[in-house]
C-alpha cells in the first residue's frame, strides 16, 4: 500500500512539474528584430570595407551585396585587398543568404531592376572607386 501511494505521489509530482514548465526565455523573432539584425550585419560589412585602401600593393575589387526579392543584388560593395578579403566575402555571403531568407519569410517585394556591376575600378586618393 505504501509503495502504491509513493508511486502515486511521484507520478503526481512529475505531472505537476511538467505542467508548470516555463516557456523558452527566447522571444520569437519578429520582422523588426530580423530587420535590425540584418542592418547591424550590413553596417559591420560596410565598416570593414571602408577600412580598405588601395595603392601599388593592393588590388581593388567588388562583390555583389544584398539580395533583392526578385533576384540579384541590391548593389556592389567596393573594397581592396588591403583587408581580410576572406572575412569580408564570408560576411557578405552570410548577409546575402540571410536577406534572401528574410525576403521570402516576410513576403518582401521590390522593383526588379537589374543593377549592373562596375565596368572597372579606379584607385583615387588611396580609395577604390567603381566606374559604371
Residue ranges, per PLM feature:
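Sec-dependent bacterial lipoprotein signal peptides
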Residues: 1-19
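First exposed extracellular module after export/assembly in secreted or surface-exposed proteins
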Residues: 2-3, 31-132
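Bacterial Sec-dependent N-terminal signal peptides
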Residues: 16-39
Amino acid at each position: 500500500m505504501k509503495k502504491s501511494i509513493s508511486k502515486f505521489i511521484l507520478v503526481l509530482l512529475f505531472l505537476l512539474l511538467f505542467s508548470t514548465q516555463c516557456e523558452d526565455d527566447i522571444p520569437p523573432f519578429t520582422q523588426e528584430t530580423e530587420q535590425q539584425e540584418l542592418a547591424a550585419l550590413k553596417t559591420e560589412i560596410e565598416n570593414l570595407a571602408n577600412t580598405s585602401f588601395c595603392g601599388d600593393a593592393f588590388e581593388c575589387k567588388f562583390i555583389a551585396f544584398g539580395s533583392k526579392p526578385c533576384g540579384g543584388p541590391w548593389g556592389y560593395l567596393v573594397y581592396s585587398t588591403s583587408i581580410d578579403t576572406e572575412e569580408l566575402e564570408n560576411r557578405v555571403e552570410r548577409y546575402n543568404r540571410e536577406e534572401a531568407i528574410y525576403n521570402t519569410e516576410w513576403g518582401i517585394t521590390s522593383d526588379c531592376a537589374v543593377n549592373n556591376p562596375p565596368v572597372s575600378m579606379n584607385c583615387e586618393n588611396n580609395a577604390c572607386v567603381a566606374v559604371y
